[in-house]
Every structure is written in structure tokens, then in C-alpha cells.
Amino acid sequence: MADKNKHHLAMAIRAINTLAVSAATLALAPSALAQEQKVLEEVVVQGIRYSLEEAADRKRADGRVVDVIVAEDIGKLPDNNIAEALQRITGVTINRDFGVGSEVSIRGLKENRVEVNGRSTMGDGRNGINFEDFPAGFLSAVEVVKSPTPEMVEGALGGTISLKTARPLDLKDTVMAATYDMEYADKADNWAPKINIAAGDSWDFGDAGVFGAMAMFSYQDRTLRQDSYETSLFVYDHTQIANLDQPAQNTPSGDYVVAAEHKFEPYTEERERTAYNVTLQWAPASEKGNFYLDVNATERDGNQEAYSILYASGSPVATADTYEDENGALNNYRMEGVVAIPKTWSSFRSTEAFTNAFGGEWNFTDKLKVSGEFSRAESKTFEPASEFNWRSVDAAAEALNPSAANELKSDLTVVNSNSKPGSVVFDDGDIFAQTENFAFREYRYIDERVNNEETAFKFDVEYAEPFDLEWVTAVKTGIRHTENDYERTQSELRLKDIYKNLKDANGDPAIIWMDEIAAAFPGSIITPGVGSDAFDHTGIAGPNALTNFTVYDAGRLKNVNETFRMVQQLLAGSNYNTPGNSDGYISTNGSVADDLVESKGSYALIGEETSAFYLQANLDFDRWHVIVGGRYVETDITSTAYNQEGTSLVVEKQSYDDLLPSVNVAYDLMDDTIVRFAAAKVMRRADYNELSPTYIFNSDRITATKGNPALEPYRATQYDIAIEHYFGTGNMVSAALFYKDIASFLKETSRCDYVPDAMATQNQSIYENICIKDFDNRFANTSDYTFASSQAEFDTAVAESRNGILTTLPSNGESGKVQGLELGYQQAFDFLPGLWSGFGVNANYTYADSEDPDGVALEDISKNTYNAQLYWEHSGFGMRLAYTYRDEFLDDVYQKRTERVGTQVGYNDGVSDPTAGNSYRDELSQLDFSANWDVNDNIGLVFNVTNLTAEPTVNRSVTGTVWQVQENDRRFTLGLRAKL
């Protein structure tokens, strides 16, 4: 078995080099038996076909329910990262960030474990490293394990994604390989480089043993763009809509759903990633074992810029063209008395992550093997963010009465669309694109840092055929101990409501106009050209004033010190220089760091210790192959946070233990047909933000999320039954049924919380989004709340301290379930003549059904998902079309912009509605293309297109009304591969 594994690893490394997206390469040393088999076959299979054959062989030989991708399969696809390769596997779906794969769900569950060579990876949460941070080129294979065994580390609810890197002692000759790609993103209109380099060798020192070393380097720098059109959905009784005299006909309550706020946001993101991987390995001359040192480090820096203009407030008015659609939403209507809030955003993300390990294994006898490993994984994330926004103000009214609100308002006509950004047209033309109509409203800077680290030790013992029982292949046992520390800090500078609360040195009302800033600071105010090509793939339903706006330059905003000094000058001598000012404080000559205020409500420190022991037996009875045993794990968690007043730290502790039995059975029904059965208990600890009793506020201090340190983990019992039939070379068909009973399901509840510090800095101009409590509960946290229907009603509530923070927090609920079917088929058509023999297909389908305790489908689970890949390879040329589809799914249980809309339509209908705030994502499909040409044995060329059809992402309320449309880049890649 060891020789076979080494042979598989060697072939995988050769695959990486052949396509050279990765940095590993060929020249590996297969076993003597494997070499003999190659000679007998007299066929060298490479490229996509080799990769699929190898994946089928590994799946067939494994005792678990598992799917495998070898590195060449990753390299051959037009896939930018591991996530986009994993989406080709049955039961796996992904989410994308700016069109790039970032999150993986296994059978609809995102609570998975991501490991490298069996050890933990670290990100800014529980799920491990972000797939955008880890180069696919570092890998020899990726396994998706759906049925665990006792020796595997606990913590996966959906499955374990096991990333495998190469070992240098598998190298036969010196390895040197390099790849160079240039990627073009069409919306960003940017060419970006990606470089991979690998070098490795091994040396035989005779009696001193064999030493090997491998080093890999990867660099990528890219710019991406995303266009986003959003609305906020409100619920109106027909009496609140002018010129409308009848209730809605298509909602249970008779209320109408109205998109009352609109904005267009073009985002541009720059991403730079540098990664290193070094492995040193030594084996003594006795060949009884080996020792290794793995060092992996990733640095990723990214800057995001965005502009928008939000049209808010106003009252809906029906016209002769107004109608109600089948979802109860109002269409073709007017909004009267709308105000404008232009915004500029800039955020930066810097992440440093590493995973280091020292370990080895030793065969004391032919039967007894021991192994151990000490590892450390750490991630440090620094994420500052800035915002600069304005408010439309009537200059003439301001001159007459500067103490009044003096908002500049306009009327607009809205024409909605089912899958495109709607049309928004102002009566007053470009009134909200003129600098003289805007006043400085707010400046905000946030400094957020997350440190996450794990120290782990494990020790394993394996004994083959104890008591000479041939049917007991091996008995394994081991221990593992970990110590985890997670810390999150946040500090903030916020200067709000400047347009209405600014006072000069004499205490008189003052205002700072946009055109004044433009004159005093040339180049600071711009009219970005991003609106001219907005949604150029998807199109817009009609004329849209949202794409024409004037804002503060994002290039200046990301220069924190430059913008801070400008704001200091603008507010010099004002009430904002007074410490304790309720709208914010800025010094006259200090630095950003000096003026930052620690957000004690956001501080979190979580310590976690786990201790695990397992016992496993591998059994063989002729046609039966069984892996059975159990894993016992103890967990101790300490959560530290500030009390609600922010005056002292409070420590809360939680302990629990789990016994996790499992069995995997494989039965050779026929020589080429395997029937599998697996059953297991699994657990997944709650994420750190679910455990931390701290508040994470949104930008307006209107909503927040909060953890619960008393949470028990997710616990589930799962069953799998599968049949696999293999035919020819690497061809297979498979079917699997799966069922998961999630016994301690986490559910989210909402309440209106009393958080004085946050309430003092609330953006109260969006009063209709702020929760209101009754008088008796004004200083309490309560689930009994409502919303103001008018500014006057809200002002009264604030005067009585009845406003609060709408807070979402998790709790352990009842059971939920996930069940489904997986079908897979792959075949190379090598029986066809000539060029036709180069064709092959790989396709799969997954059906998943899910339900939470409220009867609502679980997040991120599509009922139907399928992938189809058609490839052709012949005489050094290769091409592949890859299509991925998933149908509608619940994207978010609670989305702020749909929080008022549920199946019962409104909050105030007297019905408890668990679907209120649900957001569903429309069906998604993507078509990718790749082609390659091996010029000779050392040089290769590749061409890829990702997102050929440029499909938009559309999000809807549970009633079917569109609230968001997003569009991403179509990406083209040209690349060169070279090896020695």
C-alpha cells in the first residue's frame, strides 16, 4: 500500500508540471511494480484524462466515501483557485467573491474542515484558510472526505477538504519549473500577472541517509470589478400610498412590497498575493522511517474602492401605469420627497497566514509504526475601512434658516425589472450630480484586527495484524491536543451629522459644501466614469440616474493620513474639536491613531483547548472492507468580553465532550463494482463570532450581530450508501444517497437591544430602519419591538430612549435535516477512431433537500446542482468546456434590506414569521473554457476563459421581489509553462 501511495503521489506531481499551473513537476520515482506496469501498457496518459483516471483510481481504493482531484485537474481547468476546482465534484457548491471562488459547501453545509496534510489551516474564523489565499499550484491532490474515520480530526459537519502537498523524497531528478500567466478582467479593463516557480531535489548520502528539499513560490496581482444595484424593500398599507384605493391582491396581509431606497455601487478591488512553501525531508539509510519540516506562508493584501449614491426616504405615489405584480410588489410608481446620500468607500485587507509542522514516522517492527507531529498555524488580519459621505441640502433654504434641516429633495419615477437593475429617473434631471447641492455629512475610519492561532500535537500508533489475525489489517490509536486563541479588536473614528450639527467657533450653525472642498482641495471631488459602462453585460431596464454622481475621490480616501488631515482643516475650531461631543471628536493636530476610540462592544478574546483520543480498526473479510471505531474529544472554551456598559471584562466558560463513533464499509459486489455504507456521529464547534458575547455593528449602528458563549456545537448523525461501477481505464458511474440529522441546530433570533454607546452614534436619518421598544422595556433587551412609521414618531421614541440596536444572535434550536442523492459519470471515449478518441466527459448531478426547525430550507443548499465537462486531448493539444449550474437557494436567513418582508409580508401583521428577512439567490450557471498546447516536452501554452456567459447574480426576498443584482468580470488568461 505504501508503494502504491508513493506511486500516486509521484504521478500527481508529474501532472502538476505537465500543465504547470502549479509549481510541482515531473521526474518522480514510481515504484518498481508501477514501472513494470507502465512498460506492459506502453501508453503514457497525460493531461485531463490522466487526472480523471487517477482520481477514479484513488476513489476506488479508498475505504471512505471520498472524491479526489489530482493537481493536474486543477491546473487544466480555467480555475483561479481550489474552490473553483472543487465545484466539479458531486455534492460540492461554491460561493464567489467578485466572481472568484471563495467558499465551499459540501452537501449544502459550509461548516467544513480545511486542512493541509492533515493539519489545521487558519483564517479569520473557524473554516480555515480562505481558498483565495492558498495557491492551487502548491498541491499534488485535494480530497473531499464525506464520511469520517476515527483517526480524522473532528470539526466537519459537511465534510473535510484535505489539501495534499508533495514530499521531496518522492523526487527522482532535479526539479525546476515555472509558469507565467496574464489575466485580463474585462469590466476592470486590467491585465494582471501570476507567477509560479518550483525547485526540488533529493540527495543520497549513503549511511547518513537521504535528504530532500522542495521550495515553491507563487505571486499574483489582479484587479477586479463588481457592479451592484440594490434596493431596500418596505411594506406599505394601501392607505399609505397616494392614489391607490385597494389592498394588494397577491399578499396575505393586503400590504404592498415597495422598493423605497435605491443605489448603484461599482466596486473595484485590487488583490496581491505572495505565497511560499518549503518542505525538508530526511530518511535514514535503514529506511525505517522519515522526518519532515513543512513551512507554508501566505501574504495577501487587497484594497477595495466603491462609490454610490443612495436615494432614501420619500413617499410612494401610484400613477396610471402602476400595477401590482404576482409577488405583491408595486411596479412603475413614483417616490416623492427623496433625499440623496453619495458615498465613497475604501477598505484594505492585509492577511498573513502560516502553517508550520515538524513530524515523522518510524517503523519499529514490520508491524508496529509510530508517528507524531507538532504544528502551529496562525493568521493575522488587519482590515481598516474608511467612508466619506454627503447629504443633499437646499442652499437657498440653508441661507435663510441654517438651524433647520433644509434637505434638498426631488421626485423620481421607478420602473422595476425582474432580473435587471431597474430604471430610476428624476424630475429635476441631474440635480443630484451638482456639487453645490451637497454638504459634508460624515467621515468614518475603522481599524479592525483579528488574530487566530492554533498549536497542536498528535501522536499515533499503528499495529498490523495483531495476534496474527489476517482479517484485522491494522489497529490504530492516537491522541491529539490543541490550544487555540482568537482575538478581535476594533477601534473607530466617527464624525457624523456634520451637515446639521456643525457649529463654528462662535457656536453658530455652519455647513461645509462640496464645491467649497473641491476648490480648497483640487482633485478631491470627482465624477467617476464607472457609471458609463454600468452593467454592460446584463443591461439596465431603462434610464438610470443612479449611475451619474459626484463624490469624494476613493484614491484619496484610501490614503488615510491625507484624508484625515483634510478633515482636521475643515473642522478646525468647530464643536467637533470638543472632547465628548456626541457627534464625534477630532483633534486639531493629532494623528489618526490618537483619535481612534476603542469599540469595547466589539472586543472578543476566545481561548479553546481540545483533547482527543481515538481507536480504529481496519478489517478485511474477503469482499468486505471495514473501518470502524470511535473518537472521544473534550472541549474547554473561555470567552472574554466587556460588559454591556464597557467598564470591565467578563469571562464566561463552557465545557463539553463528544463521543463520535463511525463505520465505513466497502463491499466488492463484483470485481468492478463496490457498494459502500457509512454511518457516523459528527460535531462542529460554533464559529468564534457565534461564541463571542460582543456586538458587531453595521456601518450605521442600526443593526448588529452578537454571539452566545453558552452555545453547544453543531451535532449530527449521518448515513451514506453508495454504489460505484468502474469500467475500462478510469471510467466510472456512481450513485449515492446521504442523510444528515442535525440534532443541535443553531438558529438566529432577533431582538431590540439597549447598547448606549452604539445608540449614541446611530445614523438616525434612516429612522425607518431603527427598532423601537415600548416604554417599560426601554432599558432592556427585548424581542418585542416595532419600527416608526414617521419621523415624528421616531423623534418621540428617541426622546424617551426607546430606540435600540436590532441585534441578531444565535441559540441552540431543534433538529434539522439534509438529505439527497448524488450521481456521477466519467468516461474517456478512447474506443473511437483517430482524433475522436481524444474526447471524454465528466458529469455529475446532486439533489439535496433540507429543512430547519421552522420548516425553512437551510442556507446555501440548492435542490438541484449539476456539472458537465466535455474535453478533448490529442497530439499535445487539449480543450475543455466546463459548465456548472445550481438552482435557487436561501442565501441569507436575515438580510437587512429584506427584513420587513416575509411570507406574511409585514412585521405588523400580528403573525410570527420566521421567513422575514430571508434572501434567496436565483439560479446560477457558469460556463468556462480552457485550451492548451504542449509545444514540446519543456514548453506549453494555455488559454482560459472564466465566466464566458457573464451571468448576473440576482437576490430576491422570500416573496420573489428582486432587491439586488450584481455583475462581475469575464476573465481571460494567457499562460506559458516551462520545465527543465
Model-derived segments and spans:
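Gram-negative outer-membrane beta-barrel transporters
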Residues: 739-741, 751, 758-894
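Outer-membrane beta-barrel signature, preferentially recognizing the C-terminal barrel domain
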Residues: 338-355, 606-609, 683-742, 752-755, ...
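Short loop/turn motifs that connect adjacent beta-strands in outer-membrane beta-barrel proteins
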Residues: 36-38, 152, 168-174, 204-211, ...
